[in-house]
Curated annotation (Swiss-Prot):
This is Phosphatidylserine decarboxylase proenzyme. Catalyzes the formation of phosphatidylethanolamine (PtdEtn) from phosphatidylserine (PtdSer). Keywords: Cell membrane, Decarboxylase, Lipid biosynthesis, Lipid metabolism, Lyase, Membrane, Phospholipid biosynthesis, Phospholipid metabolism, Pyruvate, Zymogen. Pathway: Phospholipid metabolism; phosphatidylethanolamine biosynthesis; phosphatidylethanolamine from CDP-diacylglycerol: step 2/2. The keyword Glycosyltransferase does not apply. Heterodimer of a large membrane-associated beta subunit and a small pyruvoyl-containing alpha subunit. Its EC number is 4.1.1.65. Is synthesized initially as an inactive proenzyme. Formation of the active enzyme involves a self-maturation process in which the active site pyruvoyl group is generated from an internal serine residue via an autocatalytic post-translational modification. Two non-identical subunits are generated from the proenzyme in this reaction, and the pyruvate is formed at the N-terminus of the alpha chain, which is derived from the carboxyl end of the proenzyme. Its cofactor is pyruvate. The gene is psd. The modification Pyruvic acid (Ser) is found at residue 178. Coiled coil: none annotated. The keyword Cell membrane applies.
Length: 208
């Protein structure tokens, strides 16, 4: 099913924001400008443009828009293995729709409650509320972890164990600033560097 260009998660928020702005304009005229600023901000936040993933079969694509904050070899706490971890930090101006980095079947899903420290920090990976998916692809096991941030306090995930995902397929949403960690086999080769801006569903993070 094709997703609307404005994420469904934001429809009620936008209805309230623009409704309040219109009422404020009618009641207080030019003093309603802050209401309109908030409404426009909400509109850009909940945008969800269609993306066409690259055709490269060996590519692992970014699950989110944002900035690379980590590229390192670590211990994957979900599959108890050594792994290459690539982390994408999303600020409040990024698209917050989350997309599958690979084609594959969901073998497990783990939800962990936690705190809400700044998602730009490494400790967010282990301390914050998070939702992890183990995606088994033909080229290797991938774990994608949605992590709540300082402002984001709601992780939405619409898939379950046994579902199949296509690379670039939308599977979740995190409201406001947050982070996604991707754990890959150590044989994967990173294609991004720290500080690089990436586009969800389009930028290649690594190759198998």
């Amino acid at each position: 099913m094709k997703n609307p260009i404005i994420a469904r998660e934001g429809w009620l928020v936008l209805l309230a924001a623009f409704g309040a702005a219109l009422i404020a304009t009618w009641l207080i005229g030019w003093w309603s400008v802050p209401f309109w600023i908030w409404a426009v901000f909400a509109l850009q936040f909940f945008r969800d443009p269609a993306r066409v993933p690259p055709a490269d079969a060996d590519a692992v694509i970014s699950p989110a828009d944002g900035r690379i904050v980590s590229v390192e070899k670590v211990r994957d706490p979900h599959l108890e293995r050594d792994a290459l971890k690539i982390s994408v930090f999303m600020n409040v101006f990024n698209v917050h729709s989350n997309k599958s980095p690979v084609d594959g079947e969901i073998k497990a899903r783990w939800y962990t409650p936690g705190s809400f420290v700044n998602a730009d920090l490494d400790k967010a990976s282990t301390e914050n509320e998070r939702n992890a998916l183990w995606i088994q692809s033909e080229r290797g096991d991938v774990v994608a972890v949605q992590i709540a941030g300082l402002i984001a306090r709601r992780i939405l995930c619409y898939v379950r164990t046994g579902d199949r995902l296509l690379r670039g397929q939308r599977y979740g949403f995190i409201r406001f600033g947050s982070r996604v960690d991707v754990y890959l086999p150590t044989s994967a080769r990173a294609a991004v560097s720290i500080g690089q801006k990436v586009t969800g569903g389009r930028t290649i993070l690594a190759r198998f």
